[in-house]
């Protein structure tokens, strides 16, 4: 009996991965161990965008990753001074949305730049939820939230 060409074989069917606490912990640990997005995608058998989306949500608190082609520096090459300002604003706990606006970038561009350059740190709430400590990841003050 021949198989129809349009039907996928059993190993072609992709089973969606749902992020539970154990997978999130592993993702964050591997990221802070230096595994890049491509390798994380391979490790978790996911597309790069799925990895970005989860890391950005966990580490930056950004849920919406809608591109905005109307911003002045949409998909343009990052310059050294721009990177310096990005790091400075991030370290001052300025929310990613405000950083993007100030730099003339869209939110996904800023978030991906922070993730790809390993400039992002783990918020204490996320570290606590995932059972991580300073030996596992770099933990700093909560980004994007005011501290008193």
Regions picked out by a protein language model, each given a short descriptive name:
Residues 1-148:
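Intrinsically disordered, low-complexity regulatory regions
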